[in-house]
Regions:
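Soluble metallo-hydrolase cores and metallopeptidase-like ectodomains found primarily
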Residues: 4-82
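Generic structural signal for well-ordered, non-membrane alpha-helical segments
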Residues: 16-23, 91-95, 144
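Hydrophobic, Leu/Ile/Phe/Ala-enriched alpha-helical segments that form helix-helix packing faces
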Residues: 23-31, 101-109, 147-148
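Solvent-exposed alpha-helices and their adjacent loops that cap or buttress functional pockets
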Residues: 44-45, 59-66, 89-91, 111-115, ...
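Short acidic, glycine/serine/threonine-rich loops at helix termini
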Residues: 84, 130-137
Length: 148
């Protein structure tokens, strides 16, 4: 089950100071050798921390094999819309689920349960996403650049 990882990451992400660095530190507490990185992506309405994790497979490209690679993308506007909306908001579920999957796969990998193919997980951590007016509730935006 993935409940432990969901609860731990929810606790980590439900904070106005949540960051990509905190997420990477959490993932490295599970597997110190994990391939995880974070970087800041600046946009017209602020910034967000991008997080990328690679879990190598036993026969994946990382190991020189031919097993298929899968990518999990946690899409969202942001974890929070502070100060307009206090606390973790529903747009954060994409990041939470993607990162919980990464944490579970890293835990399995560290214990010897290795999937055949590589798994990539990517999302962003933004506790202060911009909003724009909409009734009855404002819509979430994203500080990053718009997709082309």
């Amino acid at each position: 089950m993935i409940f432990k990882q969901l609860i731990e990451l929810y606790d980590l992400l439900d904070s106005p100071s949540a960051s990509g660095a905190q997420v990477v530190d959490y993932l490295r507490s599970i597997d110190p050798a994990c391939d995880a990185e974070t970087y800041v992506l600046e946009g017209p309405k602020g910034s967000t921390d991008m997080v990328r994790v690679r879990i190598p497979g036993s026969r994946g490209r990382t190991a020189g094999g031919d097993a298929p690679t899968i990518g999990l993308l946690g899409r969202l506007g942001g974890l929070g819309a502070r100060p307009e909306r206090i606390g973790f908001v529903s747009d954060g579920d994409g990041a939470l689920c993607a990162l919980a999957c990464a944490a579970k796969l890293l835990s399995m990998h560290a214990r010897g349960d290795v999937l055949p193919g590589d798994v990539f997980v990517s999302t962003h951590v933004c506790p202060h996403a911009p909003t724009f007016p909409h009734e009855p509730v404002a819509f979430m935006g994203s500080p990053g650049p718009r997709p082309r």
